[in-house]
Amino acid sequence: QIELRQLQQQIGITFLFVTHDQEEALTLSDRIAVMSEGAVMEIASPGQLYESPGSPFVADFIGSMNFFEGEILSSTDSAITVETSALGTVSVTNSDAKMTVGQKAWVAIRPEKMQPVFADPGEHANTTSGTMGPSAYLGDRSHFYVHLPQREDPVLVALQNLERSIAQLHKPNQPVWLQWASDAVVVLPRD
């Protein structure tokens, strides 16, 4: 894929590449059009589509995303505060969303943007607690589910395996705290 992209750039021609493989699309593209039922939902760069999708559909279509229902408490040009039942109050910076106080919204966080902590971090912004669910070791990373008290569906968390270990890192029902950066959150209107 990387060689094909280099060849395209050296020759300087335009490629139109149709694929269902998201990794291929993200690797080979300068711009991606996400379509649904024959209609273009969004056109943007791979980074823009992944990090700042413009709709819940695109956010869910490109990669994995955890969605939490919320309501806007405050909104300025530089920050948004959202109240959610599952996560509590969420602070968001670097948001492209133009939201109004009282508006229903989705708080969307990618699984790799949620960092697990296995000892109580104390009072910390953008932190919630839960219990470990099932996990899967995938070689370079592990996926696991966290059950939150105020949410029926578990939250998917992706953790990079930075150390060489084949031991199970996480035990079911173990307490865990999830933390995320304020600029790792995407806020989307909930219609």
Indicate where each model-derived feature is located.
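ABC transporter nucleotide-binding domain
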Residues: 45-79, 113
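A composition-driven signal for long, intrinsically disordered, charge-rich low-complexity tracts
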Residues: 3, 8-11, 65-68, 180, ...
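Phenylalanine-focused residue identity feature
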Residues: 15-17, 57, 61, 67-68, ...
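ABC ATPase nucleotide-binding domains
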Residues: 1-60
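A sequence-level detector of short, solvent-exposed, charge-rich linear segments
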Residues: 8, 15, 19, 23, ...
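Non-catalytic connector elements of ABC transporters
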Residues: 65, 74-191
